[in-house]
Amino acid sequence: MASDAQPSVDQPSAGTPGATGNSTGTTGTEIVFRDVTKIFKQGKKEIHALQDINTQIPAGSIVGIIGYSGAGKSTLVRQINGLDRPTSGQILLDGQDIVPLPESQMRKLRSDIGMIFQQFNLFSSRNVAGNVAYPLRLQGMPKQQREERVKELLEFVGLSDKGKAYPEQLSGGQKQRVGIARALATNPSLLLADEATSALDPSTTRDVLELLRKVNRELGITIVVITHEMEVVRSIADSVIVMESGRIVEQGSVYEVFSNPQTKTAANFVATSLRNTPDMVEAEALQSENGRLFTVTMAEGIGFFDAISKLSAAGVTVNIVHGGVTTLQNHSFGRLTLRLTAHSTDGEKAIEEFHSHMQDSTEIEEIR
């Protein structure tokens, strides 16, 4: 995104750098929020929708913004594309503060920002090709060039044979692919995805997220994903911003937030994604056998396997009875529930030492 006061609008064409499918890609947009506040007024009452927002989204990255309903996620996105303006603060896109720009300049700027939505927002009266071509028609792109661009985009999103189909003939996943193709039509450097997968089933969600990864990987576009599903963040994002009541309560790499959440809100979201702590029924069944049960958060650098070796050396029987370990941003991470059975006083002492060591290094909970 150009940082000049008068951003230019280039018309992409097949075969040019930055055109869809070109592995050299586009340079993504850097986004910086500085002390951003948004206040809505309802009569004499003030509603602080955003409060003291400070964050930086690196160019070419994928960031997930997560929070419960009313947290301020969608309001934040509307500040980025200028559909709403903050009460105070700065929003810099590649170093250019967009807050004071007149609407005429913001319209030009929006051609560099793609948007996909939960409900797809396709024109039912236009076929797939017509929907994808719509922003190009608004730009005044010549018909032949427009048709080439649409063909290229449909191939990129895996819908080469659907150009003449109408939205009512498509599945939810196919509709969202059309939405992504349309969002890419003007060759943006920034893509905003507002709850783009929340209306889709899990399998289709995975397919759409893989397509967004392809967009980021091959085109270099910065992607901001608004969601209330931590699994979406886990699957696609480089970093995560956790919002609550209009504030950023936590932010960091996905691995950092997953492995060591600092707030209750973040911890609750992480728990919904991992789902590897025994529920009440499972816990009762596990407690029917001898031994003590511990659920341990696995992360690198906690000395877990050394601690397990010490337990075994003390004659403690160690069984993994629940959970699993996965790879997250090239780090091992997960939760394991262990049954530790001591057969001597030394074994009981070793279990206490294990518990103490894990408390100092990670999260551990004894299931009683």
Swiss-Prot record:
Entry membrane topology: Peripheral membrane protein
Record flagged with keyword Iron: no
Biased composition range(s): Low complexity: 15-27
One example GO MF annotation: ATP binding
Signal peptide per UniProt: none
Residues engaged in binding ATP: G67, Y68, S69, G70, A71, G72, K73, S74
GO cellular component, one term: plasma membrane
Bias (Polar residues): 1-14
Main location: membrane
KW Translocase (keyword) present: yes
EC number: 7.4.2.11
Region (Disordered): 1-27
Domain ABC transporter: 31-270
Places the protein is found: Cell membrane
Matching SUPFAM superfamilies: ACT-like, P-loop containing nucleoside triphosphate hydrolases
Functional note: Part of the ABC transporter complex MetNIQ involved in methionine import. Responsible for energy coupling to the transport system.
Oligomer status and interactors: The complex is composed of two ATP-binding proteins (MetN), two transmembrane proteins (MetI) and a solute-binding protein (MetQ).
Designated name of the protein: Methionine import ATP-binding protein MetN
Native organism: Corynebacterium jeikeium (strain K411)
Phylogenetic classification of the source organism: Bacteria, Bacillati, Actinomycetota, Actinomycetes, Mycobacteriales
